[in-house]
Curated annotation (Swiss-Prot):
Subunit description: Homotrimer.
Protein name: UDP-3-O-acylglucosamine N-acyltransferase
Pathway field: Bacterial outer membrane biogenesis; LPS lipid A biosynthesis
Keyword Transferase: yes
Active site: H246 (proton acceptor)
GO molecular function: N-acyltransferase activity
Any matching Pfam family: Hexapep
Organism per entry: Chlorobium luteolum (strain DSM 273 / BCRC 81028 / 2530) (Pelodictyon luteolum)
Family to which this protein belongs: Belongs to the transferase hexapeptide repeat family. LpxD subfamily.
GO cellular component: membrane
Annotated GO biological process: lipid A biosynthetic process
EC number: 2.3.1.191
Record's catalysed reaction(s): a UDP-3-O-[(3R)-3-hydroxyacyl]-alpha-D-glucosamine + a (3R)-hydroxyacyl-[ACP] = a UDP-2-N,3-O-bis[(3R)-3-hydroxyacyl]-alpha-D-glucosamine + holo-[ACP] + H(+)
Gene name of the encoded protein: lpxD
Name of the top EC class for this enzyme: transferase
Length: 352
């Protein structure tokens, strides 16, 4: 693509897209600003990287429209937009090579159950298994060795990577991506304790529902509901190695980083951000746009939208930082208390 073609492409998403410099040069691909070479495109979205305006060898740099690039316009070209980070994401999408996980049609070694509906252009890879009465939407790719049990419905344009297991009754929307090794719809962790110390398994009779445009990372596990549905709403992004327990409801466009553990019946609002290794006690609720720091332990509900939480047990950010500051001074406070105690004892002894 030429620089001018990239500019024209970005006008679908931004207005204006200002070109500073030549537009005829051919761009072969994207690169990091630190290592970009001639013929490559990069971006700067953070002020601390502005020094690379003079250091980079990139032929094209995408910057914020407020950045003054006049000193460098003779060395390379610039595209000025309102959000250079997102603009570069769109450029990456343009240059990204699609993965070929399976060819359209059903591979010879795939096993397809009875009453299965396959939409136009569906691809089912080698040794994949699709159970009875499943419905797979147009353009969806089922990679080799994926297992889809009975009565599963998958929408259009989805990608199911190798070794994914989708249990019976799961409902998946359009354009959903589920990465390798993930398990969707396994039994929730439900056991009734008995007087003798043993446990009776509670049948897990619900399902998992995953909304449009969600993405599930590798080796994530999302358990089916005891009754009703475990819900991963539209646009949710779940990182690798995340556990979502039975009957959780994750609100639209929430993002959950790796190794977070979400106990049963947790309800998260829209647009929440959950840091890596955060833990949730279960049967609690988070309001919209709640931010939970990495390794926080959330043990109760927080119903004020936009709250930032950190620490164990998790508390609002300012409160937790204040407590941490107090803890840092415990040593000196103890010394002061010990000194005062000695002085009081000495004063008492002198009176005697």
């Amino acid at each position: 693509m030429t620089i001018q073609e990239i500019r024209q492409y970005l006008t679908q998403f931004f207005d204006p897209v200002e070109l500073v410099g030549e537009g005829d040069a051919v761009i072969a691909g994207p690169a990091k600003i630190e290592s970009a070479a001639r013929g490559e495109v990069s971006f700067i979205a953070n002020e601390k990287y502005l020094r690379y305006l003079s250091l980079t060898s990139a032929s094209l740099v995408i910057v914020h429209r407020s950045v003054d690039v006049s000193l460098y316009a003779g060395e390379r070209s610039f595209l000025k937009v309102s959000d250079p980070y997102t603009a570069f994401v769109f450029v990456l999408q343009k240059f990204a090579r699609p993965r070929t996980l399976a060819k359209p049609g059903v591979a010879p070694t795939a096993a397809i159950g009875g009453g299965v509906s396959l939409g136009e252009g569906v691809a089912v890879g080698e040794h994949a298994v699709i159970g009875d009465r499943c419905s797979i939407g147009a353009g969806t790719v089922i990679a080799p060795n994926a297992v889809i049990m009975h009565d599963v419905k998958i929408g259009e344009g989805c990608t199911i990577f190798p070794q994914v297991t989708i249990y019976d009754g799961t409902l998946i929307g359009d354009r959903v991506v589920i990465h390798a090794g993930s398990v969707i719809g396994a039994d929730g962790f439900g056991f009734a304790p008995q007087p003798d110390g043993s446990y009776v398994k509670i049948p897990q009779m619900g399902v998992v529902e995953i909304g449009d445009d969600a993405e599930i990372g590798a080796n994530a596990t999302i358990d089916r509901a005891t009754m009703g549905s475990t819900v991963i709403a539209k646009g949710v992004k779940v990182d690798n190695l995340v556990q979502v327990a039975h009957n959780c409801r994750i609100g639209e466009h929430t993002v959950i980083a790796a190794q977070a553990g979400i106990s049963g019946s947790t309800i998260m609002g829209r647009g929440c951000m959950i840091g890596g290794q955060a833990g949730f006690a279960g049967h609690l609720e988070l309001a919209d746009r709640t931010h939970v720091a990495a390794q926080a332990g959330v043990s109760k509900s927080f119903l004020e939208p936009g709250t930032a939480l950190r620490g164990y047990p998790a508390q609002p950010m300012r409160e937790q930082l204040r407590h941490e500051a107090m803890l840092r001074h415990l040593g000196s406070m103890k010394e002061k208390i010990d000194r005062i105690d000695r002085e009081l004892k000495e004063q008492g002894a002198s009176r005697d």
